[in-house]
Amino acid sequence: MRLFRIPLLAMGLFFSVSFNLHANTVLADNIHSSAIALRDKKSALSKSTTIDLKELIADPKKYDFFTFRPNLEKLILSGAADTQHISILWYTIPNGSVGLHYHSMTESVYTIDGTQTDAKGVYPTGSLYFNPPESGHKITNSTGFFILAYASPPDFSNTDKIKPYTPVQINTADPDLEKNYTFTYSQAGVKVYDVPLDPKGGMSSKIIKSTSLIRYKYLGNYLLVLKGSCNINGKVFDKDMLVVAKTIETQSYSLSATAGDSCLALGLSF
């Protein structure tokens, strides 16, 4: 028996050391992963602007709007007016208007509060629409606030290039939104509707519904909470909160539901 005692002890010591090394490696990997996750959370939000749209509507003069057209103010959130950009438009009078203009790339419009009208329809609060590349329109009878995203700026000179088009329209306030549009499961507890946009238009968009506390990763330029309460990169945002990248560079956002509430959000990406 003595002949086997030393090897067995040595073997036990070997397994003990190996187990400890493995455990320490796993622990170090977990700490490293947690540190990376925390860094990414802080990084995305530090590179983003957060806007409470209710506060903006209540007191728009607190923000750095500039005059875009007569009786029409614009707040640039990312990018620049003469390039692709995300902005908020504010009609300062009832029945505001914008002259005919051309969109060489996709345009996105979300009605924060009010109504926008063009030849294709009337878009009340909660409406989302996308005009495809080579489209164009004239705005009439419009008032309120709107989130705009342009893959290229509106062109008021080359209106002869406008071709027949059909906008993609979504009523985000529709109580049957999830029934009327094809949401597919991306992961457990997360359903996504990919808005059918022309891939040549330089823009993509998703509507994300989460009932899970497990994070869904979204690479994009903004997230708008449409309903419920969303945890975005470790911070809770309620309805009408907008998180938008400060530049046109996309950011890695993580999104989940919060305890006791679901999350419905609109994501847009260049």
Cite the ranges covered by each PLM segment.
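Short acidic-glycine-tyrosine-enriched beta hairpin
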Residues: 117-137, 232-251
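Tight coil/turn sites that cap or link beta-strands
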Residues: 93-95, 126, 134, 200, ...
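A short hydrophobic beta-strand segment most commonly corresponding to one strand
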Residues: 143-161, 258-270
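Ordered, small/hydrophobic-rich secondary-structure cores
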Residues: 55-125, 132-135
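Short histidine-centered beta-strand/loop micro-motifs
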Residues: 88-90, 98-103, 120-121, 140-141, ...
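Glycine- and acidic-residue-biased ligand/ion/polar-headgroup-sensing regions
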Residues: 93-94, 103-118, 211-233
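Classical Sec-dependent N-terminal signal peptides that target proteins to the secretory pathway
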Residues: 1-25
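A short, N-terminal "cap"/entry segment at the start of jelly-roll beta-barrel domains
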Residues: 24-84, 156-204
